[in-house]
Amino acid sequence: MPAARPAGAGVGLVDRYGRRATDMRLSLTDKCNLRCTYCMPAEGLEWLSKQAVMSASEIVRIVGIGVGRLGVRELRLTGGEPLVRHDLVDIIAELRRNHPELPISMTTNGVGLAKKVAPLKAAGLTRINVSLDSLHEETFTKLTRRPFLDQVLAGVDAAWAAGLGPVKLNAVLMRGINDAEAPSLLAWAVERGYELRFIEQMPLDADHGWTRRNMITAAEIRDLLSTDFVLTPDPRARDGAPAERFEVRRRVAGSGAGLGPVLGTVGIIASVTEPFCSDCRRTRITAEGRIMSCLFSREEFDLLVLLRSGASDDDLARRWQDAMWLKPKAHGMDHVGLDAPDFVQPDRSMSAIGG
């Protein structure tokens, strides 16, 4: 068992390896209106009760502690699907009133987004990420088990038009399903000014069917894109970001340099094969108020029970600091590589953690 956080560990959310968490990922709900194959079962998942999930006032208080006392500088709202929460706009508005300069972004599947973009922007949302794995209706429906592609595309366009940019798109490639679509998806994104990020499938599916063999790796993604594009490393500093970014140029046939102008950027998030644990600066709070220092942690620390028992902000801050001090060196274990023989997949799926 790792040693407890020493008294002289300093302020903020620091772990025993010297990393400082400044990026807060907060899940608003475990509920979702899609059933993506790499995240959720087709049927039968039991949602948390309303009482088990943090209320709006509890969310606002926890964020206030993170920002005001513990050095949180960025907030991302996640789910589940945050748009299914009826008080989402009110939550964002209150967070914005309390923290006028805080970047507040949100990850969404985009279903119903077009109708909610204007109030979200007015409330103070800064930026948005939308999950989009395919532009083909049949493939999209196969992956998400719901026929909502048109709604998602409308939401992406509405977010861009409302100024919630840069709009980022997240795509998970599945072998034999949508991997061949990678070049056309990138072409579509850069043409419209969106930043596409390809994400290696992680072992966070509810069915526990993930295998390293079936995953499309970052190296394979680069190879798929190289048929149509030339990728060169983005000169901007990565600064702890999960995505390795590349400038995108169209591959030009014939003599000469063989490069066209820069069309945009693409990101590749290689959590499995090229992990970035040593630079991680994230702290995660689940919808029921539990601290997870890593997506793959099997250990959780309950803030909500403490909060509801009358704990002070100082008490909650100390509990949060103690939890983050125990953050493992890599991937929820003290080794690098999710395909290591002793890796144990967390019980929670991505929807129950918050992406």
Curated annotation (Swiss-Prot):
Key words of the record: 4Fe-4S, GTP-binding, Iron, Iron-sulfur, Lyase, Metal-binding, Molybdenum cofactor biosynthesis, Nucleotide-binding, Plasmid, S-adenosyl-L-methionine
Class of this enzyme: lyase
Sequence similarity: Belongs to the radical SAM superfamily. MoaA family.
Function description: Catalyzes, together with MoaC, the conversion of 5'-GTP to cyclic pyranopterin monophosphate (cPMP or molybdopterin precursor Z). Catalyzes the cyclization of GTP to (8S)-3',8-cyclo-7,8-dihydroguanosine 5'-triphosphate.
Catalytic activity: GTP + AH2 + S-adenosyl-L-methionine = (8S)-3',8-cyclo-7,8-dihydroguanosine 5'-triphosphate + 5'-deoxyadenosine + L-methionine + A + H(+)
Residues covered by the Radical SAM core domain: 16-242
EC identifiers of the protein: 4.1.99.22
Residues annotated to bind GTP: R25, R76, T107, K168, R282, T283, R284
Record: residues binding [4Fe-4S] cluster 2: C277, C280, C294
NCBIfam families per record: moaA
InterPro entries given in the database record: Aldolase_TIM, Elp3/MiaA/NifB-like_rSAM, MoaA, MoaA_NifB_PqqE_Fe-S-bd_CS, MoaA_twitch, MoCo_biosynth_MoaA/MoaC, rSAM
CDD domains xref list: Radical_SAM, Twitch_MoaA
Phylogenetic placement of the source organism: Bacteria, Bacillati, Actinomycetota, Actinomycetes, Micrococcales
This protein's name: GTP 3',8-cyclase
Cofactor binding: number and manner: Binds 2 [4Fe-4S] clusters. Binds 1 [4Fe-4S] cluster coordinated with 3 cysteines and an exchangeable S-adenosyl-L-methionine and 1 [4Fe-4S] cluster coordinated with 3 cysteines and the GTP-derived substrate.
Pathway(s): Cofactor biosynthesis; molybdopterin biosynthesis
